[in-house]
Regions:
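Cap/lid segment of the alpha/beta-hydrolase catalytic domain
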Residues: 126-150, 157-165, 174-182, 384, ...
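Glycine-rich His-Gly loop
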Residues: 98, 408, 477-481, 560, ...
Length: 701
């Protein structure tokens, strides 16, 4: 179940109230002179933001090349030739689409027969631009949950500013209208799940004390149609220190079940089976992921697990009968066993089969498993070309063995394939266009050696015949956290804004990520966080050693946790880089748990309010470690006022502190919309991508 709430929290769906970005009021008596910037919407803070934006725009936006490059990037984002990735609900394929005519987007659907045509006809379900115009709101679509099996009634999530907080409104597809007097939630970080057409599970801001310290719902309730939210029956009430609580119902015919998830922190949770008169704990390790499909329970522990007289390693995937497990049986079939080179990236059910997505030294391959009483039948599925990625993008687990695959690489535009297990090889349905001349470039994989001897993989995209003279403008990208893997994939925006200019693009698969499973991630947790930074620095040094670039021509970029990575590159390894772009970052690790959703990440970084943990956290807190009189490279911070996940204040304070120290190559830009993605539509995304590219190219060429 972790995959669900991790997607919601790290993605953009589960959603404090809109005013809760600076969740803890700063203590004005503190020694920090920039706490006033934590008052997100204050006149003083916004005046500072406007001044900074004007300075940055004058330097990097008002240039001879900016408009043309921005328009070129926007052309990629708005292209009608992009693949409209489908989401199957019943007989229809649904898609959310943004383009030049619909900057906020349209939610639409079509049939499989129509979708297979080069230019399918779409039936628009909801036009977000038209809705916003009619209501005088700048709505940003955040998804919809539709009630099985008819998929006619949906709970649509709409953000007023692109942040995680959303309004939830019941929508009727046949009439193309919101349901008068239907289910509706005000803007908040909420989770909702259909039980039946007249009942929901709901977690939201029910009033003071109803949210966790991490700013997510603390209470799960059962809400009946026609009754006020205040009358909803409490199912479970978590602790303020829990990360979030949610209840949900699965509607697979013959296997209807109700579950309660109590997430303790990012990597520990408890899941319960709910019945009419009790809740029963599913007795798996609290750090394990689990999922249920029909009669099957799948378990993936994050640490070694000894049970039933057998021991299983971290990252293994185990299968058991759900009813048997709940009855006390501990008989498992091992579906995936990791080794030093492999990890399980994900898995997806069809009606009768399980598809495994396996990473082998960060290169993907698929396997199809068929359940049986003993060992499951296992067959390989056609894999991706070399140095590419193949992934499952959609299945129909309740009704058929249909599956959809996306095949892509750094120089290979995506191909969308559809297949049915047992009916031969998947066939190409859609192909994305090429947005730059890939024939000029080549992709290679390399391994750097980190300080402790660990081999760290990285991908390099560079011009063919590139001179190894150290003079090539090079952009090194990284993340290194939350077990997120950075895999090969085509980006027309990177191609046009960086590669086409002659730049080299590098992606580092550092520890903290998920490229080698839980062990790779846990190697950089808490006190070991500096290993991620050592890995990134090792890749930078290896690029210089191989003659790809030199510090004066090497730039680094990362966002969110990757923004923290960038902050530490600035303070720990300034001599390695010629420029840094730090996006929507964490930087003040002393106060991060009191800002926005920061308390939810203590399992990743530690709790700075505990002296014994602050002792190691302070070693990687850039805001505290930036010093006067150092030779720091030029840096661009960018963020969004509406970011209610990390918030804009850490970037603000870091920029203000550095400027006060006398650094004159510190640049800051804050978009008002967009949430943690710093952009609410394609036009804003194109602007931010171009701003980053113009900054880097001006410093590194």
């Amino acid at each position: 179940m972790k995959q669900l709430w991790l997607t919601l929290i790290l993605g953009a769906a589960i959603t404090t109230t809109a005013h809760s970005q600076g969740s803890a009021k700063p203590d004005s008596s503190s020694a920090d002179p920039y706490l006033w910037l934590e008052d997100v919407h204050s006149d003083r803070a916004m005046q500072w933001v406007e001044k900074q934006n004007a300075i940055t725009a004058k330097r990097f936006v008002q240039t001879p090349t900016f408009d043309a490059l921005r328009d070129s990037v926007l052309e990629v984002l708005d292209s009608d030739a992009r693949i409209p990735y489908p989401s199957r609900m019943g007989e229809y394929l649904y898609n959310f689409w943004r383009d030049k005519e619909h900057p906020r987007g349209v939610w639409r659907r079509t049939s499989l027969e129509e979708y297979s045509k080069p230019s399918p006809k779409w039936d628009v379900i909801l036009d977000i631009d038209a809705l916003g115009k009619a209501e005088g709101k700048q709505w940003v679509y955040r998804g919809a949950q539709c009630l099985q099996p008819k998929y006619e009634r949906c709970l649509v999530s709409l953000s007023p500013d692109g942040g995680d907080a959303v309004a939830v409104r019941e929508f009727d597809i046949p009439s193309r209208s919101f349901v008068k007097g239907g289910f509706q939630l005000d803007v908040a970080k909420s989770n909702v799940s259909w039980i039946d057409e007249n009942t929901l599970y709901v977690g939201t801001d029910f009033g003071p004390g109803s949210m966790t310290e991490s700013s997510y719902p603390r209470i799960a309730k059962r809400w009946v149609r026609g009754t006020p939210l205040s009358a909803a029956k409490t199912i479970y009430e978590g602790k303020p220190t829990d990360m979030t609580v949610s209840a949900y119902h699965t509607r697979t015919p013959g296997f209807e079940r109700d579950f309660l998830s109590v997430v303790k922190d990012f990597y520990h949770s408890e899941t319960y089976l709910l019945t009419s008169d009790q809740r029963k704990r599913i007795e798996i390790p609290d750090d394990a992921e689990m999922s249920v499909h029909r009669e099957w329970l799948l378990i993936q522990p994050r640490s070694p697990w000894t049970v039933g007289g057998k021991s299983y390693p971290a990252g293994v995937l185990l299968a058991s009968s759900f009813d048997g497990f709940m009855g006390g049986a501990r008989d498992f079939t091992v579906l995936f066993q990791p080794d030093d080179h492999t990890s399980l990236a994900s898995y997806s059910w069809t009606r009768h089969h399980l598809i495994l997505d396996v990473l082998d030294d960060v290169k993907s391959r698929l396997e199809v498993l068929t359940p049986s009483r003993g060992e499951w039948k296992r067959e390989p599925m056609a894999g991706a070309p070399g140095l590419s990625t193949i992934r499952v993008v959609e299945t129909d687990p309740d009704s058929s063995d249909e599956y959809w695959l996306d095949v892509t690489g750094y120089l290979t535009p995506s191909t969308l394939e559809r297949g049915v297990i047992g009916e031969g090889k998947a066939k190409s349905v859609k192909e994305a266009p090429a947005f730059f001349d890939a024939s000029r470039f080549e992709v290679s994989q390399h391994f750097a050696t980190s300080d402790d001897g660990t081999r760290v993989p990285y991908f390099q995209v560079s011009p063919k015949g590139m001179a190894a003279d150290g003079n090539n403008p090079t952009l090194l990208y990284g993340y290194g956290g939350f077990e997120i893997s950075l895999l090969p994939g085509y980006s027309g925006t990177v191609g046009r804004s960086w590669l086409a200019r002659g730049g080299v693009y590098v992606v580092a698969n550092i520890r903290g990520g998920g490229e080698y499973g839980p062990r790779w991630h846990e190697a950089a947790l808490k006190a070991n966080r500096p290993r991620a930074y050592q890995d990134f620095a090792a890749v930078a040094r290896d690029l210089v050693k191989r003659g790809v670039t030199s510090p004066a021509h090497l730039g680094a970029e990362g966002g969110s946790n990757g923004g923290l990575l960038m902050g530490n590159m600035l303070t720990m390894y300034p001599q390695l880089f010629g420029a840094i772009v730090c996006e929507v970052p964490l930087l003040d690790m002393k106060r991060y748990t009191h800002l926005s959703a920061g308390a939810s990440w203590m399992a990743e970084y530690g709790d700075p309010d505990k002296p014994e943990e602050w002792a190691f956290i302070k070693t990687f807190s850039p805001y505290q470690n930036v010093k006067q009189g150092e030779s720091y490279p030029p840096i661009l911070f960018y963020t969004a006022t509406s970011d209610d996940r990390v918030g804009p204040v850490q970037a603000r304070k870091m920029a203000a502190r550095m400027e006060a120290m006398g650094y004159d190559k510190v640049w800051f830009y804050e978009n008002t919309e967009g949430g943690h993605g710093a952009a609410a539509d394609n036009k804003q995304s194109a602007f931010m991508r171009t701003l980053s590219s113009e900054f880097l190219w001006s410093q590194l060429r």
